[in-house]
């Protein structure tokens, strides 16, 4: 199988998206007869060429971080390029696009934040006349690059397993997808304790560390655009 993966993170090769994709492609490539190419959508001048490559692949996966309950602008721009590359022929066969799947990762622990864009992506596949493979949703990804290896072991194993299954079936394994998505929403009890702990500043410690590293901690409440 010739697979094209489009990394839609503005951070490119240094992104959390790239790290997850590495383990997915490791699993995918372990299956004989498969080849994979990763294109980086941050290279916006290459969008037209990547769109043409997509039409020549046997399967396409677009992976990106969730931005404001949607997608980065470079991903939307690439989607427009895919539409522009669609043949003008009226025959259904000539307009067909390879099977299309998506991976959406975010820092939010709850899967619900990615459900709106998931519905859009399913509709997008139909509009491109592609078989919709599905959308893998994974929350709680922020900070994985600074975690000890043992904390990421299960996550990376799951993505390798997902890649191996895809390499054989050209499908996302539904059980693995469900495990990766995790909880849909925090329980009422969890939300209650979060409200109790929020005033302590416990949840701000990671951000405070970054602010201090950049000499911006004392200005964290500035409002430069307020009249």
Predicted feature locations:
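Short histidine/acidic/glycine/proline-rich micro-motifs that form metal-
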Residues: 10-12, 68, 107-110, 142
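A conserved mid-domain beta-alpha-beta active-site/ligand-binding segment of alpha/beta enzyme cores
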Residues: 134-200
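N-terminal beta1-alpha1-beta2 submodule of the flavodoxin-like/Rossmannoid cofactor-binding fold
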Residues: 1-94, 171-227
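Short, glycine-/small-residue-rich phosphate/pyrophosphate-handling segment
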Residues: 98-139, 145-154
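Amphipathic alpha-helical segments that form well-ordered structural scaffolds
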Residues: 23, 27, 120-127, 158-161
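Amphipathic alpha-helical segments in well-structured domains
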Residues: 21, 75, 79, 118-121, ...
